[in-house]
Amino acid sequence: MDLKHISFRLLEVFMCVVKTRSISETARQLHLTQPTVSQQIKRLQETVNEPLVMVNQQRIHITEAGFALFQTCQQVFGHFDDYQDYLAELRGGERGRCKIAMVNTAQYILPKLLGPYSNLHPHVELPLEIGNRAEVLARFERGEDDIYVFSHPPSLEHAKAGRFLQNPLVFIAPINHLLASKSHVTLHDIVSERFLLREPGSATRMLFESALQSRGFVLSNTVQMASNEAIRVAVGSGMGLGVVSRHVLPPHDTSFCMLDVEDVNLASHWYFVVRTDRHLSHAARSFLKFAQLNLEQCLDKQWVTNELSQLNESLN
């Protein structure tokens, strides 16, 4: 006896016979002939090697083995119904996993989207990885995540990006610095100052150094810092100047000021990036659609640049 050869169709016929206690009614409901139903029950009994139903005076009675099989079938079909519901939720983005890797600065912004999304989709897991651009780029190249957040997306054939938020970079100085009181500040005024910068590989540092090089300037005095918070605190303590995303600055910190450097514009944007050569999870697709529809409700409207429709359309 090998029960592995029992088909779901055989079990479906058997369950209907048990429920209706009628061969003819089973045939009608399942669109079969009565001889076919009888044949299926006979085949099932031969496979189990036990009588499952008995006919007495044209009435069907269920044996002990038949009742035990019926209970087992209920459990099995119930589990498959649950699995079908699970698949529907998975395909609808209600379950599953959306792995996101983001550059350091984006951690100040993305939770404002992730929080409302998670409240609407509590069964979606949202594991996050945070690093500098070089680290997130390495993860992208290895295909370790579903969605990547860059301020400068990779220029690769299998990379598809959608811009969603402006990321203005600003110069900050101690509140009592000589330049703090100047209404006109230029690159020439600041290049001789000590600058507190993130490590090489940081997108902010890359953009700043590229702007300097294009103008023929080189910084002579720099101090490497491990985080944007460290730069902000160090600038406020008088250690030097810094270049950071405006989004990392708390609104009521009076230990530093922003310098309006006239002859340089360090404008950038944040992008959601996916790999087109990899399957994107249903949860990731759900999150990107949520972001497209809710950017202005979740983030500061003045910085929103919602270009996610093309990205989402390309994923359909």
Language model features with spans:
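C-terminal effector-binding regulatory domain of bacterial HTH transcription factors
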Residues: M1-H5, L120, R246-D253, V264-N316
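Short beta-strand-centered segments that line the small-molecule binding cleft or hinge
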Residues: K4-H5, Q71, L90, K112-P116, ...
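Short helix-boundary/capping micro-motifs
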Residues: M15-H31
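N-terminal winged-helix
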Residues: Q34-P35, Q39, D85, R91-H121, ...
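A short LG(V/I)-centered, amphipathic sequence patch enriched
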Residues: Q45-E64
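Alpha-helical linker/hinge and terminal dimerization helices associated
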Residues: T47-V48, L69-R91
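Beta-alpha-beta core module
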Residues: L156-R163, N167, E229-D277
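Hydrophobic/proline-rich hinge and linker segments of small-molecule sensing/allosteric domains
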Residues: K160-P200, A267-H279, Q292, E296
